[in-house]
Amino acid sequence: GFIALGLRIPGHGTVPAGLVNMAWETWLAATRLAVREARAQAPGPLPLHLVGFSNGGALAVKYALDALEDKTGTLARPDRLVLISPMIGVTRFARFAGLKAVPALLPAFANAAWLGIMPEFNPFKYNSFPVNGARQSYRLTHAIQQQVRQLATSGELAAFPPALTFQSVMDYTVSTRSIIAD
């Protein structure tokens, strides 16, 4: 059998407002805790598979990259990744998302902290999205891309676990090119 552990990422996957004051490093810390718990329930040498959708896919990749660099053996190395529309790259304009929120420092312009505010009826993704969510998404993807380049240069990327990736041609949130190239 399998032991499956679902992770509720802090500030993500509950209500869009949870992303207003969140940092991607907190998401990664929660990912590490979840993998540690999964390993406690199914200790090695049982295989460890990480499955992630969108932001969860990016966090699975970041965790796997960190595990490659971990010389202490603290981080369990995943045997395989299954990535569903992983957020490996986002639009280059996401880098500047934080600038849009600057007027929100004034109470009269609080809505500037959001890229859009709409009714929430889609169970698979937010319709409303805070600017900080876009900024943290960019920061996470940028960290992944830098780490991939560094590990490729050192030759350590060759030990990256096999990854099965699914990407929708209708997904406008993540970059398909980044999944292939980065």
Where are these regions (language model features)?
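Short, flexible helix-coil linker/hinge segments at the edges of structured domains or between repeats
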Residues: 91-121, 154
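Short beta-strand immediately N-terminal to the catalytic nucleophile in serine-hydrolase-like folds
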Residues: 50-52, 84, 166
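Conserved alpha/beta-hydrolase
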Residues: 2-16
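Gly/Ala-rich beta-loop-alpha elbow adjacent to hydrolase catalytic centers
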Residues: 51-60
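Active-site nucleophile loop of the alpha/beta-hydrolase fold
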Residues: 81-95
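Active-site signature of alpha/beta-hydrolase-fold catalytic machinery across serine-
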Residues: 62-66
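Catalytic nucleophile-loop/oxyanion-hole region of alpha/beta-hydrolase
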Residues: 14-47
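Serine-hydrolase catalytic core
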Residues: 125-182
